[in-house]
Amino acid sequence: NVTYNTLIKIADFIAPFGDDVVRFSMRQNIHLRNIPSKYLGNVFTFLTKIGITTNAPLLLNNIVACTGADTCRLGICLSKGAGKAMRSVLGKSDLPLDDLKEITVNISGCPNSCGQQAASDLGFYGKVGRSHRMYPAYHIVAGAKIGINPKLAELVGEVSARDLPKFTID
């Protein structure tokens, strides 16, 4: 997640390059474009200086989450917090994350799919779990295919919100 102040710093830095420089993707990434190659080293140095991680395994920066119950009235689960916890657990694991470059992980705090979980390799969407009491949990979906012969991810299980980070490394 990028803060307001960080976005202002980026905007100030790229302003001299013109109006057609920044794009935001459906995967919640910021793309800087139309920057002459002779300035790319400066861009890299600047982003590193303001704390934008560029050397982490792609999977860690490829986890998309909707805003969830933090600010959404429909949210059941804290999806942004779940994404942050997943990044932390995966980053500390011994898993070969560099081999998982093309894997997408999407999280929605409720069934509404704002986090686009149905279009991901591994997706989660919030639900109310019930045992002896109600608790926040996630449905697990997997196997979406984008492109030729597209297919939506299919429901494969569920996990409590508390156990979600551990689930990602098991």
Positions of the model-derived regions?
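Mobile "lid/hinge" segments at catalytic clefts and subdomain interfaces of large enzymes
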Residues: 118-170
